[in-house]
């Protein structure tokens, strides 16, 4: 069993996130959406098994800046997974706060590991996943969360987007992305869509200056 879970790639979290998102988008096709959600849930559990039973190898994997930044999609997927759990409103709120706390802790871990000191060699488009990803929490935010908290999350992730675009583009100009990692260039199209979706879902009205910049 342990050998099996050690073979589960952390990159599976990105596929799981995509499947959860697709399930939410086609929820009017109930049977298909539920099937996709079930498939995504199986993938989510496989990653959990990898984290628990293959922890030592996970620690080694997270020394790679691409793997470490893309793995933040696991926390994004966790928000979508938890939103469909049969919990009371209080339980959903506690789970949401707990996941947000874990995500913030992971951001701190990543920042301490890869930004001290900051090196362009360590910067990749997948950094958007880690620093803009928390915006997905607004897609499943409980009604009990104050508007000020929602606005803070949207504002911080919006500013992170504005800061990361020039940094990532400068890195790509100065140092070419290795061929192995070129597929992650597709991530560049995701941050703005996520911010817009999050602002709509949470009924937030971002500051005009941020909207103009985006």
Feature-to-residue mapping (PLM):
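Hydrophobic, membrane-facing alpha-helical anchors
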Residues: 1, 41-57, 99-116, 135, ...
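N-terminal signal-anchor module of multipass membrane proteins
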Residues: 1-48
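Helix-coil boundary and interhelical linker segments in multi-pass alpha-helical membrane proteins
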Residues: 23-32, 83-94, 139-151, 199-209
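Membrane-proximal first intracellular loop
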Residues: 27-35, 49-66
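Structural signature of hydrophobic alpha-helical transmembrane segments
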Residues: 32-45, 90-104, 147-162, 208-214
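Long hydrophobic alpha-helical segments that form multi-pass transmembrane helix bundles
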Residues: 125-139, 143-164
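Aromatic-anchored, glycine/proline-accented short structural segments
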Residues: 152-212
């Amino acid at each position: 069993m342990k050998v099996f879970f050690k073979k589960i790639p952390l990159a599976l979290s990105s596929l799981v996130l995509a499947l959860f998102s697709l399930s939410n988008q086609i929820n009017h096709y109930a049977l298909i959406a539920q099937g996709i959600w079930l498939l995504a849930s199986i993938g989510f559990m496989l990653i959990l098994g990898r984290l628990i039973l293959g922890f030592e190898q996970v620690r080694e994997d997270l020394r790679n800046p691409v793997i470490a930044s893309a793995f933040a999609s696991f926390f994004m997927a966790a928000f979508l997974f938890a939103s469909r759990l049969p919990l009371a409103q209080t339980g959903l709120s506690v789970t949401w706060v707990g996941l947000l706390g874990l995500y913030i802790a992971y951001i701190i871990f990543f920042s301490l590991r890869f930004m001290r000191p900051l090196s362009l060699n360590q910067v990749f488009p997948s950094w958007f996943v880690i620093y803009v990803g928390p915006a997905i929490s607004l897609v499943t935010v409980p009604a009990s969360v104050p508007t000020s908290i929602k606005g803070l999350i949207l504002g911080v992730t919006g500013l992170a987007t504005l800061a990361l675009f020039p940094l990532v583009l400068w890195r790509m100009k100065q140092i070419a992305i290795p061929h192995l990692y070129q597929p992650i260039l597709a991530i560049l199209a995701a941050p703005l869509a996520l911010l817009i979706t999050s602002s709509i879902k949470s009924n937030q009205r971002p500051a005009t200056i941020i909207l103009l910049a985006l």
